[in-house]
Amino acid sequence: MPGVKKQFQESENSSKPPYFFGHMYGGIGAVINQGSSFFCIPLDMNIQDGLKETDSWKQGSCHDAASHVVQMIRNGYEAADTFGSSYLVLDRYFLTVPALTELNQLNQSAHLLDVITRAKSSCIAYEIPKADRTPRRGRPRKKGEPIKLNTLFEDRASDFISAEIMMYGKKETVQYLCLDLLWGTKLYKKLRFVLVKYAKSSAILVSTDLSLNPVLIIEAYAHRFKIECTFREFKQQIGGFCYHFWTKAMPKLNKNKKKTDASELP
């Protein structure tokens, strides 16, 4: 079946291997609420990787070589074009320079979409460079001193602010520190970073909207888990993804095959 590729997903369950063959789906949904309950209504879902070979079979392919990270930004912007100004909440995999570059280009015509995501624990941001008091030769500095954000949980522990926030259906007491810094090699886009401590965990959240309240950023990211519930219901209640992409009539897959090897198909 077209689009099947070797995938990797971290797993702490011994019955689920980290490497497997399958389709890579990308989906977006709209978070709605009824009273205190929140739900994710699916809007779009498609295969976002592994279609290069099938597209070569036809002329005038409509599928470009953009990564699934960029495709997700485009899908979010299309939804925002229908619903109006929106926030796209993504996991930490999507904090990349190509994603932010695509977001900047799409928002040039009409600013409809902002992204809320999570940064890796090893994330490094940069201070905003200070203007020189006296003019100097050469171009102005694009970035200031680098900051390892993970070290701020201890170095600036006294600057954290406490707040009560609704997370995962219940009130949680969290501590947060909000900073506007530059991020991205050669991009140096100004982003809002929110360092969060709750229970025995910590996280670094990011927003492209510099005016958004840090508490709202934390609450919005907590709603991201609702799309995981949508995938679960789609599979268990409707039977989505319940298909086989292999058959005995097909030759066995050579797991050691290289890209330069000839195709096993006639």
Predicted regions and their residues:
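Single, function-defining residue in the core of a domain
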Residues: G35-P266
